[in-house]
């Protein structure tokens, strides 16, 4: 059976809304229009306007309302039309949702999911293309999820909705329409569990979200050069499955990290720091990080392509670590 990422997300929300009447969806265009990307399609008809709530164009307003509802015991799913617009709600996410459980000594929970497309799409320019993975991963109190496949989107969304504290669920606009094979029943997937998509012996490639597609293509190309790559899909950025990464590096002795976001203070830099500390003696070459260029993402199609990680960038990085000599 195949379903799209869009259908996987909708099915997860539908199942949890049927299972728990405290779950509701709120955001711009989520009800009558059925979501800017049709992720909430059919939910208004099934659950009504008290549980699928259209809002004015004020992320600060509806995010704050949803955080308050979570403090009161409800389970909001907040859809941002893009995580770029979530900057308007940053105070509620960081200072209220993320911190209150700790500041209350564990007395107040905040079971809320903030979800929507993150990062580049196709020529939507700098103010609609920023990747916020590293930004949210930096904040204590937030769990950060960035899946690739339809099965992982659904399984991790089920887990996110059931979590008693805030989850940042980072989707990708381009992936919404992609179809994947899925089992008949998709169970909740625990956080902090990465997945080895391909076992290998020469080099470990670590990535997440839509960059998994890039890495899969490159792994197949490099097979022709007799470079045997092990590919890890992180799925959850925070908490991070450090054990899987370290065990893989101990086997392959080389590491390349791929992310769409910027290099400085990025996800790749954090992973590299952990591996240098925990598995330094196993490395036969310096760690390579393939990332987006240090510029606001351009609108022009040729410049947008140059600013993003490419297959050639990844191939070059893998060959660099595999052919490294002192």
From Swiss-Prot:
Reaction(s) the record says it catalyses: N(6)-[(R)-lipoyl]-L-lysyl-[protein] + pyruvate + H(+) = N(6)-[(R)-S(8)-acetyldihydrolipoyl]-L-lysyl-[protein] + CO2
Enzyme Commission number(s) from the entry: 1.2.4.1
InterPro entries: PDHB_mito-type, THDP-binding, Transketo_C/PFOR_II, Transketolase-like_Pyr-bd, Transketolase_C
Keyword Oxidoreductase belongs to the record: yes
Family matches, as Pfam families: Transket_pyr (PF02779), Transketolase_C (PF02780)
Entry's Gene Ontology BP terms: pyruvate decarboxylation to acetyl-CoA
UniProt keyword annotations, A-Z: Oxidoreductase, Pyruvate, Thiamine pyrophosphate
Superkingdom of this protein's organism: Bacteria
Binding residues for thiamine diphosphate: 59
EC class: oxidoreductase
Cofactor entry: thiamine diphosphate
One MF annotation (Gene Ontology) recorded for this entry: pyruvate dehydrogenase (acetyl-transferring) activity
Repeat in keyword set: no
Job of this protein: The pyruvate dehydrogenase complex catalyzes the overall conversion of pyruvate to acetyl-CoA and CO(2). It contains multiple copies of three enzymatic components: pyruvate dehydrogenase (E1), dihydrolipoamide acetyltransferase (E2) and lipoamide dehydrogenase (E3).
Record's subunit section: Heterodimer of an alpha and a beta chain.
Protein name: Pyruvate dehydrogenase E1 component subunit beta
């Amino acid at each position: 059976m195949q379903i799209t990422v869009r259908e996987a997300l909708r099915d997860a929300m539908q199942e949890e809304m049927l299972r728990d009447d405290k779950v509701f969806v709120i955001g711009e265009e989520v009800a009558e229009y059925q979501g800017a990307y049709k992720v909430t399609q059919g939910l208004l008809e099934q659950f009504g306007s008290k549980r699928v709530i259209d809002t004015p164009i004020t992320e600060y307003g509806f995010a704050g309302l949803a955080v308050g509802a979570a403090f009161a015991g409800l389970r909001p799913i907040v859809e941002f039309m893009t995580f770029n617009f979530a900057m308007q709600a940053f105070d509620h996410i960081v200072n209220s949702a993320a911190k209150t459980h700790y500041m209350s000594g564990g007395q107040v929970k905040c079971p809320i999911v903030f979800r929507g497309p993150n990062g580049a799409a196709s020529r939507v320019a700098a103010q609609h293309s920023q990747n916020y993975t590293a930004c949210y991963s930096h904040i204590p109190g937030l769990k950060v999820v960035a899946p690739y496949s339809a099965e992982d989107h659904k399984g991790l969304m089920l887990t996110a909705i059931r979590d008693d504290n805030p989850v940042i669920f980072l989707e990708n606009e381009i992936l919404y329409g992609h179809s994947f094979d899925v089992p008949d029943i998709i169970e909740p997937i625990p956080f902090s569990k990465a997945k080895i998509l391909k076992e290998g012996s020469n080099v470990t490639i670590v990535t997440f979200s839509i960059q998994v597609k890039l890495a899969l293509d490159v792994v197949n190309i490099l097979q022709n050069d007799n470079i045997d790559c092990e590919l890890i899909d992180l799925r959850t950025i925070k908490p991070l499955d450090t054990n899987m990464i370290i065990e893989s590096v101990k086997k392959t002795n080389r590491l390349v990290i791929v992310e769409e976001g910027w290099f400085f203070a990025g996800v790749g830099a954090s992973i590299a720091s952990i591996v240098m500390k925990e598995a330094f003696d196993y490395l036969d070459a310096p760690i390579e990080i393939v990332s987006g260029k240090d510029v606001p993402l351009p609108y022009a199609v040729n410049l947008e392509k140059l600013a993003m990680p490419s297959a050639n960038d990844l191939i070059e990085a893998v060959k660099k670590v595999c052919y490294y000599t002192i």
